[in-house]
Amino acid sequence: MLSAGWGVPARLFSTLKRIFMKILKSFAALAFALMLAASCKPAEEAKYENTNAIWLWGSHMKEAPIQEWAQKGYGHILLNEAAFDKWGEEDVYAFIADCDKLGMTVHIWFQAFYFDGKWVSPIDDEKRAIKQDFYDMVIDRAKGYVEKGVKGIHLDYIRYGGTAHKHDFPECRATDSITEFCRQLNVAVKAINPDVILSAAMMPEIDSEHYYGQNPAEMGKYIDILMPMVYRYGYAGEDKSLEWVHEVSNWFEENSDQADVWVGIQTYTSNLENGDVIPMDAEGILSDCKDITNTNCTGVVLFRHGIGEFPDLNDLWK
């Protein structure tokens, strides 16, 4: 510290002291800013080169304009496994190969806990234990696809049908049963191909554990991409605000552990009086996609082909 005892003139000493104190304050401000920055979660960076995806029903596979989609900047197709029953394995795997040549990854989309038109609880209420035999059956389906070269597995109905709280026991928690399935699936398919992409459709609710058993923070430890279905038009009988879209999307990104979050959006609106579906034009869908780029999420998934006009998304994330 400067001292007047060094023989420095009083006026010069006073000037030097003021300069020195300003420098100290600047360093203190810089240190505080660095500390604040370190405490904040950094902006999420996409792990995948292309993060634009489409949900595609199996029955629509043959009509899907995949060359057009590739040109418009879509990189992932979530193909419902019903395509195998509709078209046969040979045609489905040929479709997957064609998409791969165009730079698009096909994920097989199937229902985890919805079988033969009915919800299946992953917990045996009498035994108060998970239904391991059912887990094994579903996981074996996924393993079969990965063994044949499928690069992505997309889980739909990876939840309870609104009744999780009725199957929740101290010995076997409802949320744990969903997470445990994700863990077992991860271990099984990554042993075949460590790079296979696991994704899951999520209910668009900040607290979905009570009804659906989904805990994104735990599921995100085993699932690569969480896809909350943030359907703002006609959800629960009303159109949701843009603020709701941002709030839900960002909540998932903040509570997804290591998983990426790609937001599912509609390609249609709804008539709130009679429920009729109203296809959206490309401009409207693009506007909703751009809204997602204003969140901390890193991708969009359009639901679905067959309704609405898909926009060009090549410049969406630039």
Spell out what each predicted region is:
Residues H60-D85, K148-G152, T295, G299:
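Catalytic domains of carbohydrate-active enzymes, especially glycoside hydrolases
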Residues Y212-L242, H305:
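Aromatic- and acid-rich polysaccharide-binding/catalytic face
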Residues Y231-G237, W262-K318:
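Substrate-binding cleft of secreted/luminal carbohydrate-active enzymes
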